[in-house]
Amino acid sequence: MWPKSTAADDPGWTHWKYHNFQPFQTFKFANIPRGNTIQEMIANTQRYQAELVAMAAESYRRQRYQPVTALFHFMFVETWPSINWGVVDYLRKPKAGYYALQKAYQPILPSIEPVTAVWRQGSEATVRLWAINDTWSACEACRLKWQVKQNGRVLAKGNTSLTLPPDSGSRIKDITVTPTTRHNVTIEYEISDRAGNTVGSNQRNERVESPPEQ
């Protein structure tokens, strides 16, 4: 059941391939680590899918009317015991990608755009904050609050108040920080209405690489 290697021609993958698993695309193209157990591989592949689903869905949301006019997720449910792109398996059990899609599809979305592709210790990196209101009602005097943290240390934080018009999307702020260690950086961003109720929340984690060799 557990193949000896990640090689696509390893006969151990034959049964997996029957169920649509693609070892070459998974391990060589997407560069997803297999892990030491099936459970670790499931966690690694689901994490990759969740990150990709969130990145794509949020990107399309930010491109509203420029040129995106509608958004449909493919694919949602597996129709048989398939190792594929569905975010819900054939037993109707949600994968990590389902919850990523749920967050990216919030009607009022505090979107986090990754500007810097690779974060490195000691180098500046940037994310861009957006506020998207895909409802037919204005969010009057909404409060936007954000925070960037690394290993318990706050690298940046801030807040602002503004009205989000109905059917709108706005670029709010670019945030540039310098990670000081190899620990992951977490960006937290939320939108509250004037009564203090959270109407949208989001979080993004950035892995930090070593400084480039001199």
State the predicted function of each range.
Residues 1-141, 148, 156, 164:
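Substrate-binding clefts and catalytic carboxylate motifs of secreted carbohydrate-active enzymes
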Residues 25, 101, 110, 171-172, ...:
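Generic hydrophobic, helix-prone segments enriched in Leu/Val/Ile
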Residues 96, 157, 199-203:
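Short edge beta-strand segments in beta-sheet-rich domains
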Residues 183-194:
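Short, aromatic- and glycine-rich surface loops/edge beta-strands on solvent-exposed regions
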Residues 197-214:
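Short beta-strand elements
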